[in-house]
Amino acid sequence: MFEIRRYTPDVAGEWNRFVAQSKNGTFLFDRGYMDYHSDRFQDYSLMFYADGRLLAVLPAHVAGDTLYTHKGLTYGGLVMSVGLTIVQTMTLFREMNDNLRAEGLHRVVYKAIPAIYHRLSAEEDLYALYHVCQAKVVARDYGTNIVLHAGLRWERVRRRGVVRARQAGVTVERSDDYAAFWQVLTDNLGTKYGVKPVHTLTEMQLLHSRFPENIVLYQAVRDGVVLGGIVLYVTPQVVHAQYSSATAEGKRLGVIDLLYDRIICHDYADYPYFDFGRSTAHADGSGLNEQLAFQKEGFGGRGICYDTYEWQL
């Protein structure tokens, strides 16, 4: 039997400590990250206690009669303690569903945490989704990641890009100044897709100030001009490329290849995984960008799916 409590800001410290010690949480679930856009979502995060001990948390919000975990994050799902058992997890979902139903909610949409982000195996939730909730997969997105210790050889075109950028005098530097790169990124997204970055420059500067070791910018520079950059989200198991962009000149010179050479082959070579992120156009995972997927495969990347589940209460 679980005691289910709604999250409130006065327990942010307890929430954050739990996420940091959990077997599958990342800094995206820290309230310092989640709450930067709290004005856009009606928070409905849940905390699950048994015998006075916090055993799981669910980052979530509501819209209409639906609970989402979480539309404002790359992934959501149940964040679990190391000691949470499969039987407890199944009980948790039964009781959570009863609780949500009693509150007048009718549906749950659940973005599972991809397995590469787990510090320990943590798919008890997926078993419960199927056998307790009768959940269905309603979206399957496609991304690319590298198992770094596998040492897959880069394709020749990627290796040539590294050499070309070096010969052109491009250097790579880690920077705390996001403004120049954000202009490159914003111009590219606006020209190519007619969209803006998910985060504004001000938001990214705020998040970097809160998580300086987790949110890291690498820039490719020549003669003092930023030609491209990559923003990394660094979690215990995975280094994830949150944003990657280059100017027209930067693309011609191969600066993205040079940036990835520094990041993947040197600075973060000892990490378990590097995640390039998604290569699709639509929210349900359709519209595969074949050229983008091919580029990522050229660095030794291979496929991973990001699944979204749904069930009726």
Locate predicted features.
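Divalent metal-dependent hydrolysis catalytic cores, especially in the metallo-beta-lactamase
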Residues: 105-113
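Conserved acyl-donor/pantetheine-binding loop and adjacent beta-alpha core of acyl/acetyltransferases
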Residues: 65-77
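Aromatic (often tryptophan-rich) hydrophobic motifs at membrane interfaces
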Residues: 49, 57-60, 73, 79-81, ...
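Conserved alpha/beta cores of soluble small-molecule-handling proteins
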Residues: 99, 105, 134-136
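Short, well-ordered beta-to-alpha junction loops that form the rim of enzyme active sites
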Residues: 112-115, 278-279
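Short, high-confidence coil segments that cap the C-terminus of an alpha-helix
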Residues: 41-43, 102-105, 215, 269-271
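A conserved beta-strand-loop-helix scaffold within acyl/acetyltransferase catalytic domains
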Residues: 2-51, 58-66, 114-141, 145-250
